[in-house]
Amino acid sequence: MRLVHAVLLPGIIVFVSNGNLLHAHALHEDETGVTAGRQLRAAASEVFGLSRASFGLGKAQDPLDKFFSKIIFSGKPIETSYSAKGIHEKIIEAHDLHVSKSKNAPIQYASVMEYLKKTYPGPDIERIVSTLERHDEVGAKDLGAKLRDALDRQ
């Protein structure tokens, strides 16, 4: 997979390649993750014509897993760069709000980095972090650097 864009915040990770949303994973079912999840489910409804009720938050530990496993196994990514762009902006706004109000953000970043290292070992993690470092144009400055610092301090 050629990763060209990644968005991360303490509750959720989104990977986008060539404008197609490929995968999202909620790490924690906190309020921020729920907000981002709603945006993702809305996009899914729009693209696949699926009922939003299909993705009820109480149905699984990670409400997005069931939906995204369907995409991964079908081999058909969501093909809507417009929706993906809107999701990026909303997730980054939620991230900025969360970090400005949370003293625990660095600890959460460190745990997310550990998760990423296990899931995407080797040079892939560097690629993900480097994409995070290029988010200043949309308001989430130096996310990659914050992740590295948090991991070093852990």
Curated annotation (Swiss-Prot):
Record's GO cellular component terms: extracellular region; host cell cytoplasm
Subcellular location as annotated: Secreted; Host cytoplasm
Region (Highly variable C-terminus domain), start-end ranges: 104-154
Region (Single repeat region): 93-103
Motif RxLR in this chain: 38-41
Main location: secreted
Residues covered by region (Leucine heptad repeat region): 50-92
Signal sequence, start to end: 1-19
Keywords: Host cytoplasm, Secreted, Signal, Virulence
Similarity section: Belongs to the RxLR effector family.
Further remark: The ATR13 effector protein is a highly polymorphic member of the RXLR class, yet only a small subset of the polymorphic residues appear to be involved in RPP13Nd-mediated recognition. Polymorphic residues of ATR13 appear as clusters across the surface of the protein. ATR13-Emco5 is recognized by RPP13-Nd because it has the critical residues Phe-73, as well as Thr-119 and Arg-148 within the highly variable C-terminus domain.
Biological function: Secreted effector that acts as an elicitor of hypersensitive response (HR) specifically on plants carrying defense protein RPP13. Recognition of ATR13 by RPP13 initiates defense responses that are effective against oomycete, bacterial and viral pathogens. The allele ATR13-Emco5 recognizes RPP13-Nd, the RPP13 defense protein from Arabidopsis thaliana ecotype Niederzenz.
Notes concerning its domains: Has the canonical translocation motif RxLR, but lacks the canonical EER motif, which characterizes most oomycete effectors identified so far. The leucine heptad repeat region contains five protein variants with 12 amino acid polymorphisms. Leucine heptad repeats are a feature of coiled coils where the leucines are embedded in an alpha helical region. Three of the different variants were recognized by RPP13-Nd, suggesting that alteration of the amino acid sequence in this region is tolerated.
Protein name per UniProt: Avirulence protein ATR13
Native species: Hyaloperonospora arabidopsidis (Peronospora arabidopsidis)
Taxonomic lineage: Eukaryota, Sar, Stramenopiles, Oomycota, Peronosporales
Encoding gene, per UniProt annotation: ATR13
